[in-house]
């Protein structure tokens, strides 16, 4: 089972969980979610069990006490501080969506922490028509059910959403005012995010994974990163933004890439 713990630094506290017993560090930086992914720690451990033998897997939440304004680069800085406090260096990073934005800044500002990284369904600069703005509006209005519906319809394929719609909507009943306030701060943190002009500072091996049906950020954003870095790109044709949850061999593709770049 995953162990949920808290790391305390001079500036903040951050919760995380870990599992696996390998000598290499694998750090997962999740994207936006209505409630903390830590509540699904055991499910995540099962989904990523293929890493557990060769890696110690760490998944970091955002800091516990959010400042009123919290740009993505500051999220990455706080994560770097947490990693340092836990003795994590030269890690294999997977960042999904907003977590992928954080991963870019982590590799730019703290190259010693990153051995290799995979960027999933993310962007180096957030497009003007991003669906995130609609989510911010719904969170501001306190519309938990509307936000849950919009979020799920945008990130999942129609077939996946139809299959799990009742379960997804039932989750809205557990979303608190505090959850909405936290979501709003984190979502607003993507506004003005732009790492594009600094991507050439990334020196580690990178794999970019995108989805042709991504309605949140778009597949073009994945291609833009890969073109700028000159790195490997793979686009899943039949999946949307949450391809990292839906595609059955997604984790295996990450694992193979990390194996290829291991010295």
Regions from the PLM with identified roles:
Residues 8-66:
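Conserved HGGG/HGGXW glycine-rich cap/lid loop of the alpha/beta-hydrolase fold
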Residues 74-91:
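Conserved acidic catalytic loop of the alpha/beta-hydrolase fold
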Residues 101-104, 108, 113-143:
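Flexible "cap/lid" loop of the alpha/beta hydrolase fold
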Residues 127-130, 146-198:
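Conserved alpha/beta-hydrolase catalytic His-Asp/Glu region
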Residues 202, 208-210, 214:
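Short beta-strand/loop motif that positions the catalytic acidic residue
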Residues 215-221:
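Conserved alpha/beta-hydrolase "acid-adjacent" motif
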Residues 222-242:
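Catalytic histidine neighborhood in serine/cysteine hydrolases
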Residues 239-251:
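Catalytic histidine-centered segment of alpha/beta-hydrolase-like enzymes
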């Amino acid at each position: 089972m995953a162990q949920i713990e808290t790391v305390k630094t001079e500036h903040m506290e951050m919760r995380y969980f870990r599992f696996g017993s390998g000598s290499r560090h694998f750090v997962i930086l999740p994207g936006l979610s209505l409630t903390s992914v830590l509540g699904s720690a055991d499910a995540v451990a099962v989904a990523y069990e293929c890493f557990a033998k060769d890696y110690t897997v760490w998944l970091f939440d955002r800091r516990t006490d959010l400042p009123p304004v919290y740009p993505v680069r500051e999220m990455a800085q706080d994560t770097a501080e947490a990693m340092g406090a836990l003795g994590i260096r030269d890690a294999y990073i997977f960042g999904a969506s907003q977590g992928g934005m954080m991963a870019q800044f982590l590799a730019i500002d703290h190259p010693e922490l990153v051995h290799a990284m995979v960027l999933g369904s993310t962007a180096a600069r957030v497009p003007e028509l991003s669906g995130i703005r609609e989510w911010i509006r719904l969170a501001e209005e306190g519309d938990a059910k509307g936000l849950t519906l919009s979020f799920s319809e945008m990130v999942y394929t129609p077939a996946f959403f139809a299959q799990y719609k009742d379960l997804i909507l039932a989750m809205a009943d557990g979303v608190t005012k505090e959850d909405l306030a936290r979501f709003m701060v984190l979502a607003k943190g993507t506004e003005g995010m732009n790492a594009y002009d600094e991507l050439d500072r990334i020196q580690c091996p990178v794999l970019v994974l995108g989805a042709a049906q991504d309605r949140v950020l778009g597949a073009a954003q994945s291609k833009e990163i890969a073109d700028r870095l000159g790195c490997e790109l793979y686009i899943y044709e039949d999946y949307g933004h949450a391809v990292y949850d839906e595609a059955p061999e997604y984790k295996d593709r990450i694992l193979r890439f990390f194996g290829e770049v291991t010295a």
